Amino acid sequence: CGEIITRATYQNGKYHFDTGAANSKIDEINNTQATLGKSFEFKTHDGSVIKTTDAGSYGWKISKKQAGKTLTNTLVANKQTVNAKNDIYGKGYNQQGTGYNTTSNNGIGDTYAAVSLADQHAWFYKDGKCVLSTDIVSGTNNKDNETPKGVWYIMYQQTPSVLRGLNDDGSKYASKVQYWSPFTDSGCGFHDASWRHDWSKQAYLAKGGGSHGCINMHPDVAGQAFHDLQKNEPVIIY
């Protein structure tokens, strides 16, 4: 810690450290290692490598303000190393960040869910092994309802649940589902859709044929998907 502290004073029985020089080091870490707000290189199910959008909520960054406090406390305690875990922050439901201890697979790890909007298909991975592969129906293909691309994370899980929102005409809806795993603050998530009749791969292209943004799953597989997922697990939508 000492090499990034440029000035220290002692007043009224307290140490005061200038941790401003640490900001450039934190910037370096955030630019080279942190994952929040960045696109990811991701290998899809067929081996092709894509670049995700940077619009997702998955990832972490180090807070300069909080890191300065941690460095000060570390120096006062005369320690040589510091744990930055408490200095990271995230976006959305989990403000503490996600994936901080994950370095494999470009920071995504080996346990995740991936959804191809073009293929209308989802894959669920556990420790690098695909445990479920299933067709889905995503949000209707328009600016108001399309499922947002990016790398997100499972915020929490509920069984059962009631999903509430507005239809395109402004009317309210309340849909009962057995399995609910949201991954965006705007209300997109995985859930069973017992009311759906059209499960074709073209359903989302028709007007009103897709969902309001969620990943609709057939009731026959929704339960397995729910149990394969876990809180904070990455969700790649591409």
Locate each region found by the language model.
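Surface-exposed, secretory/extracytoplasmic low-complexity segments enriched in Ser/Thr/Asn/Gly/Pro
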Residues: 1-175, 179, 229-231, 236-237
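Exported/periplasmic cell-wall-interacting domains
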Residues: 23-24, 38, 165-238
